[in-house]
């Protein structure tokens, strides 16, 4: 940073037709762009003098590190100055910011990490990918709904297939969490196709895996 961030922003402007706001030290961003002959057309700069160190306690983002690019960017998102926030920083701090700065959609119990992963055919979305140590069935149902919405609206997948990651394909497999989640997912407003084993993931057997 900031070279690769500027390059990524420039590509997003050219290929996606979006307006990009670069959040960081404005002087360093402009100097880097000039040195590498990168245009800043279609990009705005929101000055943030500091960077959140990955070794810091994630919760310190809110009070001790409000001047960092991560905190400033997420506050801008909360204030309606953007529609999405892209960050390669601390996952823990990002989740703290998402929960307490940006805030969750009303009714959503937990924020989640949702990486889109490649397969032999089409990519799938894994949710949650590591944000939560312990979940309840209703949370997995919410993850399924959010994941389906993402795959449908962003990845343009019609009726995304939702599967529950489990130790076996049969609906009687798993712990109480998986058993109850299966029942609730079957009743949820998603295209639930049942359990899926880890060995099936590379073949693209589902579009959303919870």
Model-derived features with residue positions:
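Short glycine/serine/threonine-rich phosphate/pyrophosphate-binding segments
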Residues: 1-8, 67-80, 84-98, 109-113, ...
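N-terminal glycine-rich anion-binding loop in soluble enzyme alpha/beta folds
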Residues: 2-56
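Glycine-rich phosphate/diphosphate-binding loop of Rossmann-like nucleotide-binding domains
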Residues: 16-30, 133-198, 207-208
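Short coil/turn connectors at secondary-structure junctions
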Residues: 16-18, 40-41, 79-83, 90-91, ...
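Short beta-strand segments
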Residues: 23-24, 44-46, 87-89, 116-118, ...
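Phosphate/nucleotide-donor binding subsite
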Residues: 38-82
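Short, acidic/small-residue loops that bind anionic groups at enzyme active sites
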Residues: 96-130, 187-196
């Amino acid at each position: 940073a900031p070279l690769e961030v500027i390059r990524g922003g420039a590509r997003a402007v050219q290929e996606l037709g979006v307006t990009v706001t670069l959040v960081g030290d404005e002087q360093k961003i402009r100097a880097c762009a000039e040195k590498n002959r990168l245009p800043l057309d279609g990009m705005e700069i929101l000055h943030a003098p500091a960077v959140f160190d990955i070794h810091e306690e994630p919760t310190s983002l809110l009070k001790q590190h409000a001047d960092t690019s991560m905190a400033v960017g997420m506050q801008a998102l909360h204030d309606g100055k953007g529609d999405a926030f892209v960050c390669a920083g601390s996952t823990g701090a990002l989740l703290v910011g998402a929960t307490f700065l940006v805030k969750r959609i009303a009714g959503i119990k937990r924020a989640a990490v949702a990486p889109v992963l490649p397969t032999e055919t089409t990519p799938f979305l894994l949710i949650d990918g590591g944000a939560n140590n312990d979940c309840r069935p209703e949370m997995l149902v919410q993850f399924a709904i959010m994941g389906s919405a993402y795959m449908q609206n962003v990845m343009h997948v019609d009726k995304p297939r939702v599967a529950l990651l489990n130790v076996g394909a049969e609906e009687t497999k798993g712990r109480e969490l998986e058993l109850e989640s299966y029942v609730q997912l079957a009743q949820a407003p998603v295209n639930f196709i049942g359990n899926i084993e880890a060995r099936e993931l590379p073949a693209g057997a589902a579009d959303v895996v919870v």
